Curated annotation (Swiss-Prot):
Keywords: Glycosidase, Hydrolase. The keyword Lipid biosynthesis does not apply. This is Neutral alpha-glucosidase C. It comes from Mus musculus (Mouse). GO terms for biological process: glucose metabolic process. InterPro entries: Gal_mutarotase_sf_dom, Glyco_hydro_31_AS, Glyco_hydro_31_C, Glyco_hydro_31_N_dom, Glyco_hydro_31_TIM, Glyco_hydro_b, Glycoside_hydrolase_SF.
Amino acid sequence: MEAAEKEEISVEDEAVDKTIFKDCGKIAFYRRQKQQLTKTTTYQALLGSVDTEQDSTRFQIISEATKIPLVAEVYGIEKDIFRLKINEETPLKPRLVCSGDTGSLILTNRKGDLKCHVSANPFKIDLLSKNEAVISINSLGQLYFEHLQVPHKQRATKGNGQNTPAATSQENQEDLGLWEEKFGKFVDVKANGPSSVGLDFSLHGFEHLYGIPQHAESHQLKNTRDGDAYRLYNLDVYGYQVHDKMGIYGSVPYLLAHKQGRTVGIFWLNASETLVEINTEPAVEYTLTQMGPAAAKPKVRCRTDVHWMSESGIIDVFLLTGPTPADVFKQYSYITGTQAMPPLFSLGYHQCRWNYEDEQDVKAVDAGFDEHDIPYDVMWLDIEHTEDKKYFTWDKKRFANPKRMQELLRSKKRKLVVISDPHIKVDPDYTVYAQAKEQGFFVKNPEGGDFEGVCWPGLSSYLDFTNPKVREWYSSLFAFPVYQGSTDILFLWNDMNEPSVFRGPELTMHKSAVHYGDWEHRELHNIYGFYQQMATAEGLIQRSKGKERPFVLSRSFFAGSQKYGAVWTGDNKAEWSYLKISIPMLLTLSVSGISFCGADVGGFIGNPEAELLVRWYQAGAYQPFFRGHATMNTKRREPWLFGEEYTQLIREAIRQRYALLPYLYSLFYHTHVSSQPVMRPLWVEYPDDLETFAVEDEYMLGSALLVHPVTDPQTATIDVFLPGSDEVWYDSKTFAYWKGGCTVKIPVTLDTIPVFQRGGSVVPVKTTVGTSTGWMADSPYELRVALSTQGSAVGELYLDDGHSFQYLHQNQFLYRKFLFCSSVLTNRCANEKGHYPSKCIVEQILVLGLKKKPSSVTTHLSDGRAQPAAFTYCAETSALRLEKLSLRIGEDWEVRVG
């Protein structure tokens, strides 16, 4: 390791090589489960042992093969959520928990429309809605639970004679990886032996499944009958392949299934390595000659089987019963939390590179945005800003006066983000290392010493963020007196927190490493980065004494990461295929609870051609997190370096983003309080339209805007599907309109961003764009009113100070509702609890879909004052435009169209 420490660390050390990473066939617990399940293994529920409490029912289940009892607990949770936990009744050691009739048992929710039917032999659970099966558990008999065993060396003294898979030949043990597992030069020694679990779920009538990020794959989950299961195992995969089910940076073990009339979810709460197999049995059509019409209906239903397998832990699963997509999103948020309300600046454009070289480079790039009239909010610094990759430090030569640099950014109402990774350079003279070492805050190796691996600084130890005391200490490092050179405009980026360990097995930490509570790393691998982001966000809140919202971007994530900030899709490439795959990747994150997500604009690896860069900016402008980023060995690609033609196109895309911020910020408030995604697949808004279920090249931004990015080179036309047969859609640029329920061919040039506003919506935008969000606080609004086929429209605006928690603690916010009905546009308060002084006015109103020119337009204030408003009307586009208005955004008023 000493020699490794001295070696040069470069980006190639983490370059993707698929031989570095396991496929399913090389994962021992997967092989064991697949092999054992080919045998007849039946579990029986002992319903004579039922113990019912107020909120749970407990009973034993037992395998005919092992005769070792398991304990099953079924919980009927409010909000139409059911929970099943299965654990050993008397395990040798604790297993990590991430938080009547003898023939059958029936549990019913309070409303009586949902029933949980437990069958005894063979053990099976059916979740029924209105007496029709929605989800069945263990209907395929794939329940699998490896009981903890006494190690071989102790077995003679313990006298353990239980019949287990471990009682096999030495050769078979090695093949099954029971006590140790080999992969390349690495040997994973398992102190507790085999401990994997698995269970199958049958989704009746469903064939469209989504979720279980993160994979560079389609939004709709694919069948895995080829043996290529979806892998959930957080890994640093530099330049990952597209259309691949291998695990990459984050894992959310949460799956949604959707059909006409119902959406359900399965949340498998397990932080160890997990594999998911999916198999859809299509609907079978029967003619009336084969069977009578009464029997035909149940035979037509399709079914999708989902098989979850985890390396360790217990079975702890939540079934979310919907029935609507919105209901499932809310149910999932009850368990894992909603998206944190971001500070407004973080919804602006972020400029990043590995690395901006020094303070002068930062100053020059910052000035370049102003010189070219391109707004941006945040400058980012990667690992090279530190002294020898020691986080919480500054390179004394290149960043000699970091506060002065930040004050320059502050003067322009901009922010700075710096990186802080979980690996800590082994250096006794480095304060952070010395303090953590002294207090025992690093992950341990099996022998009890500090785990050491190689990452950017060379030889490193890794903070054990699973320890609450470590998180508390880490949070304290962000205090201004401790983090020398930091100011209140400095925010954070957690990278490499899968965790990444160069030259480790699969470039990550050994599974035998030991965490707080003596838990092996294998038990909680996927939640490691989650805890770092949690501690970082808490540190930023603490440094402001609880007043200011944090901003933290994390590469690794787990279920619930939405509570602490944003994530992105990792180290993508500057290729068209990565622009295209970014859309389904972000849609999958969005429906899995993580709304604040984005992809590196332009692609992190490689040099994008100008056309690709423009198209990526145009897509990113209409996605939640908007950051340009590039690796160190690429050409510089600031927006003005590709010639004036392309500078103008990128400028326009970014300016469109800034104009749209009132709508986008309102969407984030909506997801913060009600968990509806910001970026939505079409099926979420049109749950009964079969044509939307597999669409992944376009999406909804909120409920009002449909976006279809151009993701192929030299495109002259694109086919856009406009859903809703009884709806109307308006081109946001030309105001041309189409009836919904059809696919339209749209001509595009390089300056075209295909965005359509839904009839029946009101979208608030800013009429002027500043150099950053801070300069736009008092800028006027325009209301874009797109009328439905019935001539009505509705929308909303959320407004607060954009940075503090006063919206939460002191109700300092405005929430306004706009309604156009019977030729009258009204602005009314949508939440009487909120109060916020705003100088902003509505200066312009655009009404699309007005079939004839009005004779007059008048404004009416709450004090009774009325006055005529000047207007223009275009008969060709049926567009009415009002300008030079002065209607206060926080007051009630009406605009009457005569």
